[in-house]
């Protein structure tokens, strides 16, 4: 039971990093990026490919961060000529193109079978020692990610992003480059998601095309809605809640006679019911976004 608990919390910490990066876009800036899993996949496959060719695990993370930092602004630049809803569809298409590329490219990405046997940073440890080391690392990375995102959102940069979300025309009239700001936030959020993807791959020692399905992005949106979209603390707690739901659903077979092939569908159903309940009763999530009030005196 201890092993399972350590696994659940570690995965939750990894997804918290993923959720924080999406919160910068969807929560703070109002950018609906339906293909955010692409950045997660870039980090994951970068670590996998580097490890496959005998490279250091840290180098794999750096490669993923670098590629995501370049891809993010390129995707953001597409918003210059596209409306927000069309841009969201384009991001989904880009993520699907990436998934199809890694599915059909066998030399580097392993094709449909993916890349297995990836060596992580704690390969010399065994048992609970390895699990605890991974937990500490992922919690530290999630904590640093939280501090970075919280600092950014409290700075003038964050205030500009919220202005873009609420009043884009006003932001433009004040001289802010809307496309430039979108490119900047994607240049920050993309690498954060890539770090989460790298940690995920190094932790489970495997990455395949199924980890890049669109449902992964929408699962993180669920985390944000449950935790509180626009709130970094909510993003982290939302990741924990969803992972606990995922983990707890595995024990349903001990109480209810559920066919093994239906287990994954039941898991999605439970998450969907919880999401619906939050949208109906507490749409602001567990931690509502707190906006600072500024008193204007004449």
Listing of model-derived features with the role each one plays in the protein:
Residues 1-298:
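Transmembrane alpha-helices and adjacent helix-loop boundaries
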